[in-house]
Amino acid sequence: MNPVGFYLLTDTHYFAPCLGAEGKAFENYMKKEQYFIKESASIVESVFNRIADDKETDIVIIPGDLTKNGEKESHKGFINELYKLRESGKKIYVITAGHDYNEWSYEYRNDERLEVEGTSFDELYDLYRDFGYADAIAFDKLTHSYVAEITGGVRMLAINCDAWNQPKGTVDERLRAWIKEQLEKAKSDGCSVFAICHYPVIPSVPVFDLVGDARVNEWRRVASLLADNGVEVILTGHMHIQSINEFYSENGNRLIDICTSCLVGSPAKYRKITIDEKSVMKVESIDVGDFGWNLNGVEVQDYFDEQFGQAILNKILNALSGGKGAVGFIRKCATKFIRKATVGTLSRVLFIRIDKNLAKKKLTALISEIGLAIFKGDRPYADGTPEYDAVSRLLRRFSFVIKKIEPKLEKDGVKRNLKEMLLNTIGSNNGFSDANAEFVLK
């Protein structure tokens, strides 16, 4: 691949400052939201200003979920920021995704959630024409997928798997045929190609393979199509996670999926990627950092992490709540136990041996820490750590349940080892970092 460098950021979820973000309805919503809404405009502006100051890198790529929920005012505000960034000399390429058009455009005022003007999928082309579409050498009207030659001999295949006219995360047969046609054309023109897609193609962590909305549908077929037709790198988002994963097709061809976190929520990273004349690709993660708000002495990363951790915990507790009769009673007891118990308490109830250093830790704190660590990348709780050993013993205790579940998870002839998937989700066995990595491309 010819030398190229660019900034990669995704899931900006821009929310226009002119829209309301206050009151009880907003506060209740934020209890389960992993990323910031009120702060989003300042975060985007701050990061864009920093990127604008880099005079050596002139390409910026943003793979979808540009706004909170397609609010018309949010699109206007975000596009204004894009134009300011373009004036600094940057070439900007975007794709849109489900949060950029839907039926859930709201603001929050006077303790209420109020509907505001949204955006249709058909409007997105004209709104973002100057940020990729106008430079397209091939364009798929149904999905707004496109191909652009971002520098001499290097083309970007922008796959929109989140269009209005198909199930979310779908690269259907028609679009696959279009993709193959574009890759064959690039090869005949002597160009190398990398791809972008909002949804991860390769599941970011093993357990996400079981979650339909966590990766593209029929992901192995899509990954093989790309790898076997010359695409070695795809840049993704959607899951708000820092991850880098490799997939090899049956023909032995590799695809590297670089998934980047939400810009406005923990882990709050963006990336700078360079490919040199020897086809060495370097991936660097950059902290969002200070964005000009008074955080009352709280460190910026802690500010992001606290919101994320609390939201994860609240979602789990909310999932356990509700129900009627015996089921409701059991769920209520489980929720109460999780809120109050330490890890040591749980270990005694289940007769599980744990490291004494974990015993006094609140169970809610451990859940938040593990969840946050998964999304930050590099999943530190590998074999040999107290956390890994505790989870392993917990899963062993419930092995009879897992064995009953596993056959139901089998799909397309692929059997699942649920215990292994869960343990490899909290502890990485990759030979490279999810944050900063280096690969030699073909």
Segment roles from a protein language model:
Residues 53-59, 91, 155-157, 166-256, ...:
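His/acidic metal-ligating clusters that form di-metal
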Residues 1-7, 16-19, 143-158, 188, ...:
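Beta-strand-turn-beta hairpins that frame and shape the catalytic cleft
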Residues 15-17, 68-71, 101-105, 165-167, ...:
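Short catalytic/ligand-binding loop motif for oxyanion handling, primarily in non-cytosolic enzymes
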Residues 1-72, 172:
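N-terminal active-site segment of His-dependent metallophosphoesterases
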Residues 284-295:
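Short, solvent-exposed aromatic-acidic interface loops
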Residues 72, 77-180, 251, 272, ...:
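Extended active-site neighborhood of metal-dependent phosphoesterases/phosphodiesterases
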Residues 1, 294-442:
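Non-catalytic terminal accessory segments
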Residues 11, 64-65, 97-98, 198, ...:
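Active-site glycine-centered loops adjacent to acidic/histidine catalytic or metal-binding residues
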